[in-house]
């Protein structure tokens, strides 16, 4: 009898893979193992839970039991995988083990918490489970410090501000979204956040946190400090690679895979936030969806390479939403920016006047798909 496919993880990547496999094969044994409850929720919703007044349990879309019944799965929630014996093709936990024919690592990524004194006082919002652990503190907090001005930090800053909280956002960079676009493009959102009342501390560094009788004292550089009720780390994600490393797989920033989502071991694959595909870590929904479609085919005997088109990234800041695509972080692009009351269109062109990237906002976002078609593959 076939041992089938074992998937470690239960997030968006794992679920997309299950759905794509079941479209093609209704009977191959599928086993999912994960440390969480395995209930389904929409992770991007975490950026808006405070202004929406949602509790962690409100985010659940489908329970683990319903998922198992719908897709004919064996599920092992609240289970920590401790080891992979790649030679014997066995996955082990403290109390169990599973034989596999093919293994998929969909272990995701964890929130990076800056290594400063008092780092244990920082909260993270990278999962329903993490939100459940701190939802009361966040709901009751009047003053919130967000560490990190990237995509998630900017979304959270706007959300907490919309919920009526006093928000401070701190980042080492000179502008928000610095890893995604140049300051002349992000300045529109930066100005809107300031208008809403977000206190931006750019070119600034958090040096430590300390619990006080009235909150948390955050010590900053240049002999500054502020007191808040909650501190959230939004300083990026780190792919979960420890299990893959113990299995002897190649690790760089993530678990290294080729265009077929295959690791150096022919029977082990990686998908989603933990995977580094030909040198790229792509922690966004669309590349994960496309990767899951390709991997499902390959696990069932095909040999299909992943080919990713130019894709949109959406920044969900409702007061001033943005869509971007292409090589927006390239330093050599010349930006042509058209700004009006209805929104902004920023085109990044190279030395040959070829469009390489764009950012659109508000009502001008309807132009995104037309611009997307003109980007080189």
Swiss-Prot record:
Entry protein name: Nitric oxide reductase FlRd-NAD(+) reductase
Pathway: Nitrogen metabolism; nitric oxide reduction
The family this protein is said to belong to: Belongs to the FAD-dependent oxidoreductase family.
Native organism taxonomy: Bacteria, Pseudomonadati, Pseudomonadota, Gammaproteobacteria, Enterobacterales
Species whose genome carries this gene: Escherichia coli (strain SE11)
Keyword Oxidoreductase: yes
Cofactor requirements of the protein: FAD
InterPro entries for this protein: FAD-bd_OxRdtase (IPR050260), FAD/NAD-bd_sf (IPR036188), FAD/NAD-binding_dom (IPR023753), NO_rdtase_NorW (IPR023961), Rbx-bd (IPR041364)
Cellular localization per UniProt: Cytoplasm
Known catalytic reactions: 2 reduced [nitric oxide reductase rubredoxin domain] + NAD(+) + H(+) = 2 oxidized [nitric oxide reductase rubredoxin domain] + NADH
HAMAP family linked to this entry: NorW
Annotated gene: norW
Cysteine pairs bridged by disulfides in the record: none
